[in-house]
Every structure is written in C-alpha cells, then in structure tokens.
Amino acid sequence: MYRKLAVISAFLATARAQSACTLQSETHPPLTWQKCSSGGTCTQQTGSVVIDANWRWTHATNSSTNCYDGNTWSSTLCPDNETCAKNCCLDGAAYASTYGVTTSGNSLSIGFVTQSAQKNVGARLYLMASDTTYQEFTLLGNEFSFDVDVSQLPCGLNGALYFVSMDADGGVSKYPTNTAGAKYGTGYCDSQCPRDLKFINGQANVEGWEPSSNNANTGIGGHGSCCSEMDIWEANSISEALTPHPCTTVGQEICEGDGCGGTYSDNRYGGTCDPDGCDWNPYRLGNTSFYGPGSSFTLDTTKKLTVVTQFETSGAINRYYVQNGVTFQQPNAELGSYSGNELNDDYCTAEEAEFGGSSFSDKGGLTQFKKATSGGMVLVMSLWDDYYANMLWLDSTYPTNETSSTPGAVRGSCSTSSGVPAQVESQSPNAKVTFSNIKFGPIGSTGNPSGGNPPGGNPPGTTTTRRPATTTGSSPGPTQSHYGQCGGIGYSGPTVCASGTTCQVLNPYYSQCL
C-alpha cells in the first residue's frame, strides 16, 4: 500500500507511550472467527480486537498531563526518546464512544469520524489470541476468507484488512521498556516503515520529530518500524487491491531517517522493504466493470461480499469472491506476456515491465515474501484517509499528471481532485466498514463449512471428488490448472484438472482443482 498513516488522523490532542496506566479501563471488544480443517469442518474461535497504541491517550505516569499535544511533544516530559518512555504511559480505550469501534459476534464495524470529547478519525485494530497476545496466522498453504461491507466507503477512504510480521506479544520480550505490549496495541510495523509512530521498540520517537504541515495531529520522527506486509484487502466502494510487500528482513526492525524509505522518507526506495508491492487491482488491469457500486458491476459494492484468498506453497496467490450465492474468480488479466488470474512470479515480472518500477523484485519478490507467509503474521483491520496522496493510488489516476494512456496510471473512477481528508471527513463522517465471518484453514476448507450454508443461503454442498464424464473415442477437453475453477452452476469452462489434482465441490456454484 502506498500510504498507511499510523495515526490515520487519529485522536486529537492526545499522546501515546509503551507502558500502561489505568485512568481508563482496557476491555477488548470480543470477536469470534472460525478455524477450518481440510475436511471442511470449521470450529468457532473466541477472540477479541485491540486498538493500536498510536490512538491512545498518553500522559505522565503520575498525572493526566499529556505527553503529546496536537502534533508536538511535551518538552518537559519528553526531552529525548529514553526519558519520554520512562515518563509517559498509554491508557485504556473507550472503543465505541471514542473510536467508533463496535463488535457483535463475528462482526467488526469501524466508524470513520467519531465525536466525543474530541474528534477521532479512523482506527487500526489487531485480532487477539489472548488478552496479551496477538493472533498469528501462517498463510502459506492455507486460505483466508471474510465478508466485507464497503457500501459506505466513498472515494478517498480505505477499509483495509491485511497481515504484518509484527511480534505476537507487541515487542515485550525483546524490549523491556515496553511493558504495555499487545494488550495495549504496541509493536506495529509495515512495509512503509512508518515514522509517524510515537513509540518504537520501547522508546519514544521524539528525537528528530517534525510536526506535519497538513495534519494538526501527526508528525514524523527519526525512526521507523519495518516488516513484511500482505495486503489482502485495500478497498472502498470504487476500487480494491491485493498486494504482497516483501522486506529483506521479514520481522519487525527499527530503521532511521530517510534510510527507512517508504511513504515517510524523501528516498522512497532507500529502505529494506518494498513500499509499492505487486498489486492486483482489477480496474488498473483494465477490467473497469468488475467491481463497483450498482448492478452494472460484476461485484456490486452496495452489497456485502465474501473474499477468499489462497496462498499456494509455490508462493503464488489466488483469489475468488462470493456474492448473492454466486462465486466469481479473480478476473483474467492480459499484461505483456502474462495471461491469467493468478498473482505469481510471471505476473509480478510483467507488472513491473508494463507499469514501471523494480522495488518488488529488488526486495526479493514472491520468493522472499514466502518467508513471511511461512511464519506467523498478525491480522490488522483498519479504516483510514490519506494525508499524503488522498488515496488516489487506490481509486483514481495516479500520479495525477499521467493520463489514461499511461499504463497502470488509472486505478479507479474517482476524480483526481477527490480524497482530500478535510473534505472526506466533513462530507462523509458517518462512513464505516464492516468485516465479518472470518475463516482460516487449508486451501479449499473455508468455502462451505460443514453444517453451514454458502453465502446467499444456498443448500450446503459437500467436499467430494468429482470426475467429469468422458465420451469413449473423443479427444480430451481442455485441462484446468491447479487451483482453477472446474465446475459449478453456470460454469462452462474446463472440467478436467491438471495431473495430481482433482475437482472438488466447495459449494453448488464453485468447484476447484485441488
């Protein structure tokens, strides 16, 4: 992703730290999800969510005096990084009333603008395994599915669901000065190596801090926090993108100044992470009628949809969607020498050749990225607006001086004048995103859990091996590749699977070569 503000225009006139105080109690909103087995049986898991430390009220450990006010630090409490960490603590969160975050069963909603004592914009949350530990997912060889409602997200907003290689305990075991840990949402990192984090590795980020020129609540410090990032879903009602970002070091590490690269540095490509990624945005790839608001689009964003992402052991990534009980594969793309709908090495090579850039391959491409997906990654869900590029990289023409004839420049139908945070916040304060029905398991396991109905309420299907009928003496038909669709109501493509795979029914509308 291009611009992921760690303080997505966050809580006004507050501060943050990495030890905990108790003036406000901390109770994580509960959120259930399902873990599925290869046989298709899914069991409910009891989890919760926690808001990132950067949103929290931070004050002196012995009083309610702010350590950070507006977009500047207290010179008394925070003269340097180490002293600030000793003097300041972060406090609990009133999730619904302050941050617009609510849960119900397996559903999480994040509101855009919430007005309480102060104004809050957006939020970033992590799924918890326990009260003090983030839930980790090993993506390689597995699939991840969820339902999402983006109907209320206009141009300029991003309801994101993604994974990062941050520490499961929030950094407590590595950095003794961080005593708040995952319980208070510490330890964030991503492929932009964000420098707007108030605390990194148990110390403040006050040294070298420069207040933002266009955001009264944020700034950039001397350090950043880097790690690999898998953007499963960056989207609003206009555009959506799927993007892996490798780093030469997989897990969380601190960086310094412009050596961080990414959004927050003058040298975007000067760090250890790939800030651009290998993105799959159907609109950018020329399919302008696949995703958008209204019945004229294949996927109608005025309605909830299911998103299923599969991580092959080869490192390739597959995607399909379900809406109103009908399954839709990722649309095919024709890009240079590449033709298909799988995000793989050939696709990423073709994208760089056609659209320009080499950051993804320079940082090791999918081979390096497999090192992240083969280990534990933390699930992040957020809603944010973009003070750096107005989200134009997701839903408009970007860079704005390019035209429709420039390969890859047009990413969505939004105007190049859209997405200005001040306008979006005033015009769409009630915007929200809802994520629900999270499932995780081996490839082919989450599409139709035992005893449940496929999306849209169709009768449950069974996971069985189906051999297509053959006619004696006829020539064999076309063969479907591994992970490709091989059957289902309304499907007319190849039904014979490649050698070593069989056609398995996931639901009445979708069978897949597995």
Curated annotation (Swiss-Prot):
Q: What is its EC number?
A: 3.2.1.91
Q: Name one GO cellular component term.
A: extracellular region
Question: Where is the stretch described as Disordered?
Answer: 401-481
Is this entry keyworded Endoplasmic reticulum? no
Q: Which residues carry this modification: Pyrrolidone carboxylic acid?
A: Q18
Q: Where is the signal peptide?
A: 1-17
* Top EC class for this record: hydrolase
Q: Which cysteines are joined by disulfide bonds?
A: C21-C89, C36-C42, C67-C88, C78-C84, C155-C414, C189-C227, C193-C226, C247-C273, C255-C260, C278-C348, C486-C503, C497-C513
Q: Where is the composition biased (Low complexity)?
A: 460-479
Q: Where is the active site?
A: E229 (nucleophile), E234 (proton donor/acceptor)
Give the family per the record. Belongs to the glycosyl hydrolase 7 (cellulase C) family.
Give the protein's recorded name.
Exoglucanase 1
Whose protein is this, by species?
Hypocrea jecorina (strain ATCC 56765 / BCRC 32924 / NRRL 11460 / Rut C-30)
Q: What is the lineage of its organism?
A: Eukaryota, Fungi, Dikarya, Ascomycota, Pezizomycotina
